[in-house]
């Protein structure tokens, strides 16, 4: 999203932060167990069997936060965004309570409980750690704290975890951690978008959008944000709102899953070798050049990709280290790219938006669609009802799902690079910033055999959560869950193009009066560099 123009989106994310735990509590899923896919490797079979076994175990419905308490009643962060099974996690905790405990939950299906308790600590002595400090000139907030405890992960399955900090006073916060996969061969890869989580993390008063003055303080924003600090709000709202529901569905279906974060994809060129699919959920805006290159190479080798949101890969980042280790700093200068130390040295690494100078490389060459703007609130309109993605939904051309498009949206834009053949599955008229436009859900197939889907709306995963804001209905939730299930089933079975080729229909999608594509109109106001 464009810096300095994000009021509606920040309000939306604030609603998310306040209600993420409650939203999670109200979720339901309609997908049936069993992947329906034909396993194509030994790794695929083994991972699928393990996932079915894991989710048959008893869950714990008491994983949710019941009481946040005061902002600093208890907060913490992990010294590792991810670990391999068996590697310890170091926790840094600050609390006003005399003691606290930690419960570690693996997120999944677990017969509707949606989490399993893997470990719990004894009572740990609590104390308030020092105030946050600032690194200049990038306005990088860091919490230079002493270690509070080490969490063992022996025998922990790979997956997305929430470590819940419970102060003796009743205050609670989450610390998200990924127990990552060493290999992704034959598996559907779930990506935890740690770079984007950190970009929106306002803990300490700064994120990549604003300084302590809030929405009017763009000029004082951070130019680099550190993982060496807690997350704001409940500690995990980006995960709970934008990612958890997709994980729940995939786990319930018994698919062979692997788990990684932004940081591993950035670091490891061959991490995705042999993967069936990559799933990025909800909001995955911040990508580094190595991450994009590694995902593109995997697509070119036949890996399917599902972008289950909008605004994906809009921002170009660099990943660097902090005092606690490698890949714990997300750098993004945005419109201040002339200040980026890489400017004039290696412009391919300058952290302007992907489509902007000094080295424009629009994200649509991978995503198929292109992020257009925000805010909007519109109905989702089906354009290609006989697509395999809409199986078991009963839709017809023009079927409408109220409020599904928002707050940010993508569109197929032929002014920029577009992969062909591409099939526009929904073509939803909307207004944004006083301009008429469309949101598109689109699917393309690549010569490698890969299938790539972009849902075109940031509310997709939220709708799977039975969210009732924005006019969303149970009918919409059932629709999004079924389509997501169809995608996961098909993509788990390997390169999708042969069985599910895209039927190019881009030429039948017409502009309407005031359309920004027809008028080559930029929806964003001018920004002073």
Predicted regions and their residues:
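C-terminal region of N-terminal signal peptides and the immediate post-cleavage residues
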Residues: 23-42
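Glycine-rich, aromatic-lined ligand/substrate-binding cores of catalytic
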Residues: 323-468, 472, 476-480
């Amino acid at each position: 999203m464009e810096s300095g123009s994000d009021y509606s989106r920040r309000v939306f994310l604030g609603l998310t932060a306040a209600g993420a735990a409650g939203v999670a509590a109200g979720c339901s899923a309609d997908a049936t167990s069993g992947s329906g896919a034909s396993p194509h490797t030994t790794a695929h079979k083994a991972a699928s069997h393990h996932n079915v076994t894991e989710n048959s175990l008893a869950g714990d419905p008491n994983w949710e936060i019941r009481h946040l308490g005061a902002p600093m009643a208890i907060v913490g962060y992990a010294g590792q965004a991810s670990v391999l099974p068996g590697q310890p996690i170091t926790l840094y905790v600050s609390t006003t309570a005399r003691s606290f405990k930690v419960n570690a939950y693996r997120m999944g299906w677990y017969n509707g409980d949606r989490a399993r308790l893997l470990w719990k600590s004894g009572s740990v002595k609590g104390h308030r750690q020092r105030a946050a400090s600032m690194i200049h000139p990038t306005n990088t907030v860091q919490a230079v704290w002493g270690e509070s405890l080490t969490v063992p992960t022996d025998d922990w399955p790979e997956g997305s975890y929430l470590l819940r900090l419970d102060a003796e006073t009743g205050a609670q916060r989450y610390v998200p951690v990924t127990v990552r996969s060493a290999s992704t061969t034959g598996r559907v890869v779930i990506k935890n978008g740690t770079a984007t989580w950190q970009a929106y993390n306002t803990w300490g008063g700064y994120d990549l959008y604003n300084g302590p003055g809030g929405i009017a303080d763009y000029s004082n924003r951070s130019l680099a944000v550190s993982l060496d600090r807690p997350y704001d709000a409940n500690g995990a709202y980006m995960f709970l709102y934008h990612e958890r529901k997709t994980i729940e569905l995939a786990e319930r279906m018994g698919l062979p899953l692997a788990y990684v974060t932004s940081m591993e994809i950035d670091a490891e060129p061959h991490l995705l070798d042999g993967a069936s699919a990559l799933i990025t959920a909800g909001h995955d805006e911040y990508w580094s050049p190595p991450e994009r290159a590694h995902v593109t190479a995997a697509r070119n080798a036949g890996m399917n990709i599902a972008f289950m949101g909008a605004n994906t890969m809009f921002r170009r980042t660099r990943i660097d280290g902090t005092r606690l280790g490698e890949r714990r700093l997300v750098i993004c200068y945005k419109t201040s790219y002339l200040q980026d130390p890489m400017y004039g040295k290696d412009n391919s690494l300058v952290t302007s938006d992907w489509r902007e100078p000094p080295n424009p490389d629009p994200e649509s060459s991978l995503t198929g669609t292109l992020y257009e703007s925000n805010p909007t609130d519109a109905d989702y309109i089906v354009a290609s009802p006989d697509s395999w993605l809409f199986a078991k939904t009963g839709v017809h051309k023009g079927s409408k799902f109220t409020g599904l498009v928002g707050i940010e949206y993508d569109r197929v834009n032929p002014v920029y690079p577009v992969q062909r053949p591409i099939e526009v599955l929904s073509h939803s008229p909307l207004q944004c910033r006083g301009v008429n436009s469309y949101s598109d859900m689109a699917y393309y197939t690549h010569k490698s055999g890969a299938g790539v889907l972009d849902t075109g709306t940031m509310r997709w995963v939220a709708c799977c959560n039975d969210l009732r804001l924005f006019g969303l209905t149970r009918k919409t939730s059932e629709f999004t869950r079924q389509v997501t299930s169809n995608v996961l089933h098909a993509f788990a079975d390997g390169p999708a193009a042969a069985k599910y080729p895209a039927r190019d229909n881009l030429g039948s999608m017409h502009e309407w009066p005031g359309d920004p594509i027809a008028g080559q109109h930029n929806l964003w106001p001018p920004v002073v560099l």
